[in-house]
Amino acid sequence: MFKVIQNFLEPKDFNALKSFLISEDVEWHYHPQIDLKTDKEWFNHCFFNNNEITSNAFKFVKPVIQKLEGKAIIRIRANLDIQNPKTYQCNYHTDYPFECKTAILYMTDGNGGTQFKNPNKKVSCKENQIVIFDSQTQHSAITQTDAKQKIVLNINYF
């Protein structure tokens, strides 16, 4: 199961994080494939990984961490997909093979989203909406066709 929360962050915190992510100050790292069945490109910016802060902009994700009330962070990264001419659903996957939580905070509106395998449900991209679920839940990214970019913040935590 998953839980969806609208207006997750206070507007000032959400706007500060979004302003950073759409600015020229963010370092996006290029990935030539989102999965093995396509050559669809994507980008990410890692804030936290392997028990260390990996971004000078970590301060922007602190309100997210506080609101989630997790005990420990595994990884926090922003993912950027560029507009596609047609909708594409990536392969289903799980984030980690052990018990933990995943939260996806949508930074932009659009017709993309996250597809869950069981139950067969889609959560659409809506600004400041978050979906929280067990990291072993099979899910898939869905690309957008109606917006120049889809940005999500992916948080894995205990």
Q: Model features per residue range: what roles?
A:
Residues F48-F158:
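Catalytic core of non-heme Fe(II) oxygenases with the double-stranded beta-helix
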Residues M1-A72:
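Non-heme Fe(II)/2-oxoglutarate
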